[in-house]
Amino acid sequence: MLTYAQAGVDDEKTVRALKNIIGLARETFKFRRGKPGEPAENLGHYSALLDFGNFYLAMTTDGVGTKVLVAEAVGKFNTIGIDMIAMNVNDLLCVGAEPIALVDYLAVREPDEKIFAEIAKGLYAGAEKAGIAIVGGETAVMPDLINGFDLAGTAIGIVEKGKVITGEEMRPDDAVIGISSSGIHSNGLTLARKLLIPKYGLDYEYEGRKLWEWLLEPTRIYVRAVLELLERVEVHGLAHITGGGLINLKRLTNYGFSLEMPPIEGIFKLIHENGVPLEEMFRVFNMGVGFVAIVPPEEKEEALGILNKYYESFELGRVTKEPGIRVENYGIKL
């Protein structure tokens, strides 16, 4: 089991299966045409944008995926809420929106007061980091359907017209800046779990931490860093590096990227040492870079100064005229 597809997650198959849903969903845009909340047809690669006159309401939905299985296995539920909020608010940032509110969806086999209390702690911590309000939610108790629990949410943000980040402003030689991740975040857990847990067990010590600690490290929330960046620097593109790894950059532009990625360390090193090919690593995991900002070359130093106040950030490379993503220091083209 050396690829995500072999672990049971076939992204290409998912894209093919979604075509009918996406096509019919776009057909529903006409139901709001000429009314408040009309969807913006060609804007929004990470989040939908709804037109409210002088501003757009950005909207997105996401969950935690199989990271919840690790939480269940070790009985640690107080950070999983941070992950769910991070997955949503970081996506809102990518269109230039300020996250403002979220509703959560918790599906369980049976309610457990102690577990709910721990999940709530993570939701509160995530909301505080993101500066958002949790304004509602749904708890579904479904013993015939759910074995364990699932946690997801839908978040909204706002962005003024004229300030939407689409990637259209990107040009060759723009600087590509990476903001470091905290680890695996909330993507690639299916492959990591199925590869590592049967071989080592969750209590396996690796570089001073147990395997479950590596896997449950909360996803970083980049709201404060990116909002300050947007206030002070001209930004041409933003990308949350989630499922698909660096392939997420292709959402922004038809231009290409020439990158020098950080050394492979921590949980990524362990996964790679257990047989996952390098190209697959960069297609599945964030590889130490949780968020990317693309800025004009002359703005690079100021951008790095801002972002490094929050998390370690570094110049990854540049935008190129030639399409494709090249990881130069590992000899990989995606």
From Swiss-Prot:
Top-level EC class: ligase
Organism superkingdom: Archaea
GO molecular function: ATP binding; phosphoribosylamine-glycine ligase activity; phosphoribosylformylglycinamidine cyclo-ligase activity
GO terms under cellular component: cytosol
InterPro entries recorded: PurM-like_C_dom (IPR010918), PurM-like_C_sf (IPR036676), PurM-like_N (IPR016188), PurM-like_N_sf (IPR036921), PurM_cligase (IPR004733)
Pathway recorded for this protein: Purine metabolism; IMP biosynthesis via de novo pathway; 5-amino-1-(5-phospho-D-ribosyl)imidazole from N(2)-formyl-N(1)-(5-phospho-D-ribosyl)glycinamide: step 2/2
EC number: 6.3.3.1
Reactions mediated catalytically: 2-formamido-N(1)-(5-O-phospho-beta-D-ribosyl)acetamidine + ATP = 5-amino-1-(5-phospho-beta-D-ribosyl)imidazole + ADP + phosphate + H(+)
Any coiled-coil regions, as ranges: none
The keyword Ribonucleoprotein is annotated on this UniProt entry: no
Principal place of residence: cytoplasm
Annotated family: Belongs to the AIR synthase family.
Protein name: Phosphoribosylformylglycinamidine cyclo-ligase
Source species: Thermococcus gammatolerans (strain DSM 15229 / JCM 11827 / EJ3)
Gene designation per UniProt: purM
